Amino acid sequence: MNLDDIAKRTFLVIGRVGMDLSPDPPGARTKDATQMVVAMGGSSANIAAGLVKLGCKAALVTCVSDDAIGWYCLNQLDHYGVDRTYVKKITGE
């Protein structure tokens, strides 16, 4: 199997999506950082995004909170082209 064969496939990835905060400048200790860089986190979400980047179709099965962090995660999944049909918003947590 080569990369062209993989790119024709559809993947269903089960796991977490989240928001990563990294200190800026890189290498700074978190407690000393004056700025933070925000990025999509969660190994499953990043795997799904990587599969899409390789030309595959990928959907993520997960839950997100119905708040600013959850909305950020949904926007990032859209940005990377990950199908979020199976992403459920959880309220009241």
Where are these regions (language model features)?
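Glycine-rich phosphate/adenosyl-contacting loop at the front of the ribokinase-like
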Residues: 2-83
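A short, structured active-site edge motif that brings together acidic residues
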Residues: 86-93
